Every structure is written in C-alpha cells, then in structure tokens.
C-alpha cells in the first residue's frame, strides 16, 4: 500500500498534473448552459435576422429567415471582396484646377549661342569640338557611344597637353555676355543688364540664366499678361563658330524655360530662334502633383544633396557623379558635388567608358518608383507656344545699323529678338489623387454591412466575443481530455 502511494505521488506532482488540476478548477458550462448561451446571443445580437431564426417556432419561417440571412451574408462578402480588390488595384483620378492670381512668378530663362566657341580659339585648338563632346557627354540622359575616344589626334593632344583645363578654355573662349552681345534687355518695363544673368555650363558651353535661384524668384513677378522678358542679342557670327558636322550648323540662340529652382535641361528640350527673327513666346505655368507608390510612381523620401528641389534631371546628374567619383576618383566639372576635377586623360580613360557602363547596366534609371530617379512628386513646367516674324524691318534695320554702328547686312545676320510673356495670369494644377482613400474604403464597407445585415463595428465586436468564448470552452475541454489520455497511457513508475 505504501509502495503504491509513493508511485502515484510523482505523477500527481508533475507538470501535467499541475496543469490538469489548474484547468479542472476552471468551470466549464454544461451542454444546457451552452445552448442557453447560444440562444441568448442569437436573440440579443445587433446582427439583424438571427433573432428571427432563433425565436420563430414555425419551421418554414425559420428556413425562410435562414435563407435571407445566408443570402445577405453572401452578398455582403461579395461586395466587400469587390471593394477590397478595387482598393488594392490602387486606382487614381486626375483633377485639373485653374487658379487666377494678381501676380505670377516668372520662370527662369537660360539661353546659349548656337555657335559655341570663338573662331580664334578654335583655329588654335581645332580638336576642342571633339573634346567638348566627350566632356559634355555626362549631361545627356541616355547615350551609349561607340569607340569614339580612340582618335589618334585626340590622344596625341591629351598626351601633349596634360595641364590643359577644358573648363577654363570654354569659360574664356566660349560665348560671353556683355553690353555688346546683350544689346537690349527689359523685364516687365524695367531695364536689365548682364549682371542680372548667371553663368552656367551646359552642352552648349557658356550659357546664361535670367531669374535663376530661389533668392530672386520672389521679386521677379509679373502682374499683367503680355508683358515679361524682352531680349535683343548679338550672336557675333564673325567672332564665334562651331563644327557643322555633328549638327551645329545653325546661327542663332537656343533657350529653355524652366523653374527657377531647377537647373536648365537642354537635352532635346530647347527652343531656338535664328538670326534675323523675332521669336514671340507665350507661356503658361503648369504644376503637376504625382502620388507616391503604389498609387503613383514618385518617392517623397528621395532627397538630393546638391539641389534644394528634387528633379529627375538633377537626380540623374547626382547618380552619375556618385558612380564616376567612386570608380574614377574624380568628378566632372559639369556634375554637382565636391571632388577633384577630372582632367582630359581621366575623361578618356575612365569617365567616358564608365558612362557607357552606367547606361548598359542600368545603374542610373528614371521614371518608375523603383528606379534610381523616379518622377518628382511635384514639378512645375512652362508649356510654350512660339511664333516667328522677320526681324528687323527695313526701317528698323537702318535704325539699328546707325545705333550700333554696324552695316545693315550685319544687323540681319547677327541680331536675335526674343520676347517671353505669360498668356494669362493663372496657373493650372494637374493633381493625381487616390480614387479610394482608407476612410472612404471603411465607409463603403460599413455601408455594405448596414445595407445587407444591419451590422456595424459593434456587431463585429459582439461576434468576435461570442466566437472567442465558444473557442475558449472547446479548447479547455479538449485540453483536459488530452491531459487525461496522457496520464492514462504513461508507464507506472517503480522504485
């Protein structure tokens, strides 16, 4: 007898025994109590139709109400499923709004001479066209060049001019802006001069920007449509020249209209005005707002180090600069950032091949949300309409020839007249918007719950509470059964 009690002791004091004793103290409802619990829930829940099933004594009515409830639940599930599918397709709508204002900010205007270099300098360094094409390659959006850096003449020049600075050469021997080349400048009735323009390097060499930077944006506004910037430029054809082989055979001015917060981008986007022409440009301000992924393709988390305002063009320049600086140990002067400037030998041996490598491998891509440079979330553009007329007239030719002390032929072959005005004092906002927001989705789902089942969030909580309680009882019941089976099948312990 004593031996039997000692053998039972460890089993009762084991972990399973303790769990069983603890669970056995939790009272489980009897089958009658469980039926009463189910019935009370059915007649008290705010889920419409269930109490009609529970309270009706007529079997036919029970079946009818059961069919109604099941049908309503089926329709509810179908409607909610379709709403969720539609939401996760991330649909968008586009709204267009026109805002009228008393004053409107004037854009930046960057212009360049189509004849990029001084004739005298080109006569001494004829290779400059080829060299500049290699150097300015960093500004092009997409291009994979052939093996064009292997010209013997170019290689000889690079080898014999190790200290040659193409930056200083272009700055000193490219197009310049002074009172001779800027014959007349007027902005909204006020005279402007070369000091109001900022020098920038582009693929066209020396270029000049009016109204560039955030510090001047606030003061350069116009309050009357039809009045803006007027420029009369002298391109000095006899002093500046270009290589007609790659397509620089025109004479005149190329210009681009852009946001004061963004750098000029000429790659296929410039407007041009030939000599002997008056270009009348009317513009409108268009603001575009894109949604972030997954509704749109923009990424608001991307910030640029060298630009206050994000743009795809600025992002691509920083991306190229990062790869070139890492792989070549230098930085092209046309790209943003701080670093040792690349010399011509670096351009030949490293920068140009790396640019081809970047393009082939897709290291600097643009457009979609997962690209290196997705579309900006906000951008301002200036769609332009341009009209030309012959300039100057015969009488104006005589007047300008006398004023500038030049021949009439010189006036016709060198002067370019550009006028840029707003068509209206308004701007258009094109905004991409979420077709279905989270509050709208919740409201729609709530409406479906109310329409088909007369339910609400409180009803859902009631159902969750009912299911949790029922599951808890079933779980405790089966757990006790399992523990009892384990103790029965465990071998007896012997001393």
UniProtKB/Swiss-Prot annotation:
It catalyses: Na(+)(in) = Na(+)(out); Li(+)(in) = Li(+)(out); K(+)(in) = K(+)(out); H(+)(in) = H(+)(out). Glycans are attached at residues 147, 163, 306, 370, 405, 421. GO terms for biological process: neuronal action potential; sodium ion import across plasma membrane; sodium ion transmembrane transport. InterPro entries: ENaC. It is a multi-pass membrane protein. GO terms for cellular component: apical plasma membrane; plasma membrane. Residues 1-61, 481-495 are cytoplasmic. Gene3D superfamilies: Acid-sensing ion channels like domains (2.60.470.10), YojJ-like (1.10.287.770). Keywords: Cell membrane, Disulfide bond, Glycoprotein, Ion channel, Ion transport, Membrane, Sodium, Sodium channel, Sodium transport, Transmembrane, Transmembrane helix, Transport. The chain crosses the membrane at residues 62-82, 460-480. Inhibited by the diuretic drug amiloride. Inhibited by diminazene. Inhibited by extracellular Ca(2+). Residues 1-30 are annotated as: Binds the plasma membrane and stabilizes the channel in the closed state. Pfam families: ASC. GO terms for molecular function: bile acid-gated sodium channel activity; ligand-gated sodium channel activity; proton channel activity; sodium channel activity. It is found in: Apical cell membrane; Cell membrane. Disulfide bonds join 112-207, 185-192, 298-377, 315-373, 328-350, 330-342. Expressed by cholangiocytes (at protein level). Detected in brain, liver, duodenum, jejunum, ileum and testis. It comes from the Eukaryota. A motif (GAS motif) lies at residues 454-456. Residues 83-459 are extracellular. Forms bile acid-gated sodium channels and may play a role in bile acid-dependent absorption and secretion by epithelial cells of the bile ducts. Displays high selectivity for sodium ions but can also permit the permeation of other cations. The gating could be indirect and the consequence of alterations of the membrane environment of the channel by bile acids. As a sodium channel of type II unipolar brush cells of the vestibulocerebellum, controlling the electrical activity of these cells, could play a role in motor coordination and balance. Belongs to the amiloride-sensitive sodium channel (TC 1.A.6) family. ASIC5 subfamily. Forms homotrimeric channels. This is Bile acid-sensitive ion channel.
């Amino acid at each position: 007898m004593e031996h039997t009690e000692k053998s039972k002791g460890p089993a009762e004091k084991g972990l399973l025994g303790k769990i069983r004793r603890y669970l056995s103290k939790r009272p489980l409802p009897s089958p009658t109590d469980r039926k009463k619990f189910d019935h009370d829930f059915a007649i008290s829940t705010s889920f419409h139709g269930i109490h009609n099933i529970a309270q009706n004594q007529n079997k036919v009515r029970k079946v009818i109400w059961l069919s109604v409830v099941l049908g309503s639940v089926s329709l509810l599930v179908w409607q909610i499923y379709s709403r969720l599918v539609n939401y996760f397709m991330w649909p968008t709508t586009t709204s267009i709004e026109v805002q009228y204002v008393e004053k409107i900010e004037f854009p930046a205007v960057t212009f360049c001479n189509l004849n990029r270099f001084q004739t005298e300098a080109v006569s001494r360094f004829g290779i400059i066209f080829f060299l500049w094409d290699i150097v300015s390659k960093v500004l092009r959006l997409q291009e994979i060049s052939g093996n064009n850096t292997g010209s013997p003449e170019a290689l000889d020049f690079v080898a014999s001019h190790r200290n040659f600075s193409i930056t200083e050469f272009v700055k000193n021997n490219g197009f310049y802006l002074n009172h001779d080349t800027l014959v007349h400048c007027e902005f909204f009735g006020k005279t402007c001069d070369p000091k109001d323009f900022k020098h920038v390097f582009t693929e066209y060499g020396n270029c000049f920007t009016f109204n560039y930077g955030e510090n001047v944006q606030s003061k350069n506004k116009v309050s009357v449509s039809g009045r803006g910037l007027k420029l009369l430029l002298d391109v000095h054809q006899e002093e500046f020249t270009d290589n007609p082989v790659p397509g620089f055979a025109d004479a005149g001015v190329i210009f681009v209209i852009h946001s004061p917060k963004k750098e000029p981008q000429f790659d296929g986007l410039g407007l041009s005005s030939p000599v002997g022409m008056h270009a009348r440009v009317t513009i409108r301000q268009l603001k575009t707002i894109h949604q972030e992924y997954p509704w749109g393709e923009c990424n608001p988390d991307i910030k640029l180090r060298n630009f206050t305002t994000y743009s795809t063009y600025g992002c691509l320049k920083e991306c190229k600069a990062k790869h070139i600086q890492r792989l070549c140990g230098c930085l092209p002067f046309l790209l943003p950032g701080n670093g040792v400037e690349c010399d011509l030998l670096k351009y030949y041996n490293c920068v140009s091949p790396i640019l081809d490598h970047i393009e082939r491998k897709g290291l600097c891509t643009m457009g979609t949300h997962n690209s290196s440079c997705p579309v900006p979330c906000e951008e301002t553009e200036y769609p332009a309409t341009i009209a030309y007329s012959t300039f100057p007239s015969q009488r104006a030719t005589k007047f300008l020839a006398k004023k500038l002390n030049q021949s009439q032929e010189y006036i016709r072959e060198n002067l370019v007249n550009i006028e840029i005005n707003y068509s209206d004092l308004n701007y258009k906002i094109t905004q991409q918007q979420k077709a279905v927001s989270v509050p709208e989705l919740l409201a729609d789902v709530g409406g479906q719950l109310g329409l088909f089942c007369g339910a609400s969030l409180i009803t859902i909580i009631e159902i969750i509470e009912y299911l949790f309680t029922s599951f808890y009882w079933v779980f405790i019941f089966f757990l006790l059964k399992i523990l009892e089976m384990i103790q029965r099948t465990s071998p007896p312990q012997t001393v």
